[in-house]
Amino acid sequence: MIKRALISVSDKTGIVEMARELQSMGVDIISTGGTAKTLSDAGIKVINISDVTGFPECLDGRVKTLHPKVHAGILAIRSNEEHMRQLKELNIETIDMVIINLYPFKQTILKENVDLSEAIENIDIGGPTMIRAAAKNYQDVVVIVDPSDYAAVLEELKTTKDVSLKTKFKLAYKVFEHTSHYDTLIAKYLREQIGEDEFPQTLSLTFEKVQDMRYGENPHQKAVFYKEVGANVGCITAAKQLHGKELSYNNINDANGAIEIIKEFDEPTVVAVKHANPCGVASASNIYDAYIKAYEADPVSIFGGIIAANREIDEKTAEEINKIFVEIVIAPSFTEGALKILTQKKNIRLLQLEDISAKIPKGTYDMKKVPGGLLVQNYNSELLNMDDLKVVTEKKPTQEELEDLIFAMKVVKHTKSNGIALAKGKQTIGVGPGQTNRVTACKIAIEYGGERTKGAVLASDAFFPFADCVEAAAAAGITAIIQPGGSIRDQESIDACNKYGIAMVFTGMRHFKH
């Protein structure tokens, strides 16, 4: 039976109603600071924490509840005769319910221009200590950290005069989930202040649920989408859905791929993605022309794909997009007329991501879960260093070819390995993704390009192990190649390029993607 409840909350949602209901059941309310004032102002009788401890709050409120009369009252096992004897001897009363949520550390660090001292002041000490104590003694103490649990607990109390052990256990689990999340945010924030690139000895990650999904990558797989706290700049988690059905697992994965590619480009660009691989990418002087070129790059694969643009979608562009079926259109904004046109199709998802071109922050991790472990690396934010570009052939690329080579490298960087991208006039004309050997990827890209490969350039995400890709490129009329270099047979590829009059540039930077 609950006789005394300790309440101290930062999020005061529903707390007055909760306390009033508890008091109507004969429960004494103990409280601290601002919570005590809120409850008192609402006409609820409150016992101040200092009246329980016999010790005043001090150090600007830093020390309020860190006292044996609080923690012994929470931690005492009621069925343990020795525990109860000691409480009586020390004149300590039990505390049967603890309702606490912690200082708003997350909200503080997400504010603009927050400084370290303000963040530090919002690290809760007493709160985590009390809720962990209550959760440890869950068989005797009800602990609530989430206002959404108030109603269910009250319903049980009204119905049975008590709270079931099953409910207490569930609430205790939520405490450790809550404190783990809280401490991980603190550790992450402090690590970011140090600014070191070294990987920590232990890696704690915390994410918040965004939505349950109908299914995962396939219908027989369950799935949920979580977001990383504070990492929403230019990310899919920050996108605002303006129209259409709920995003699926595959939608989010593909949309993320499109966003990552579009970040590589400064001039008006449109990216079309299918199964996380680019199928059409083009840059132009305006977004309409960029879309037309991206569509014409591969009008078959774009069907049912994802489109991302780095400029506002206008009516003219929307009219063209509406001629085919696409799953998603992502852009920094849409004109009112464009929205009117695109929303004629009820199933198309329209996502607004205002800062779509924002670069991924330095220090961002790229992670891949494997059974029993986690692979972690720095995010691949680099493309190439212009100072490291090395022309290795007799023929040098023209300025136009060089611009197309860099364009193609931006695309192939985001193509599953082994990957090849062909481009001409800042438009992909063929992409060969995800092959187990490079020459097959090359042949696929050339097949997509058809007659357009004449005068095009080729980008490879890794070095050529043999000269066979150069042979295939020469036969297709390709005039320039960009690749990392680094093969023990580089000279064979260089000799082949010289034989066919192809310019070749080494970047010294590989871009595998798995």
Curated annotation (Swiss-Prot):
The keyword Transferase applies. It catalyses: (6R)-10-formyltetrahydrofolate + 5-amino-1-(5-phospho-beta-D-ribosyl)imidazole-4-carboxamide = 5-formamido-1-(5-phospho-D-ribosyl)imidazole-4-carboxamide + (6S)-5,6,7,8-tetrahydrofolate; IMP + H2O = 5-formamido-1-(5-phospho-D-ribosyl)imidazole-4-carboxamide. One of its GO terms (biological process) is 'de novo' IMP biosynthetic process. Its EC number is 2.1.2.3, 3.5.4.10. GO terms for molecular function: IMP cyclohydrolase activity; phosphoribosylaminoimidazolecarboxamide formyltransferase activity. Pathway: Purine metabolism; IMP biosynthesis via de novo pathway; 5-formamido-1-(5-phospho-D-ribosyl)imidazole-4-carboxamide from 5-amino-1-(5-phospho-D-ribosyl)imidazole-4-carboxamide (10-formyl THF route): step 1/1; Purine metabolism; IMP biosynthesis via de novo pathway; IMP from 5-formamido-1-(5-phospho-D-ribosyl)imidazole-4-carboxamide: step 1/1. GO terms for cellular component: cytosol. Keywords: Hydrolase, Multifunctional enzyme, Purine biosynthesis, Transferase. It holds the Pfam family AICARFT_IMPCHas. It comes from the Bacteria. Residues 1-145 form the MGS-like domain. The IMP cyclohydrolase activity resides in the N-terminal region. Belongs to the PurH family. This is Bifunctional purine biosynthesis protein PurH. It comes from Acetivibrio thermocellus (strain ATCC 27405 / DSM 1237 / JCM 9322 / NBRC 103400 / NCIMB 10682 / NRRL B-4536 / VPI 7372) (Clostridium thermocellum).
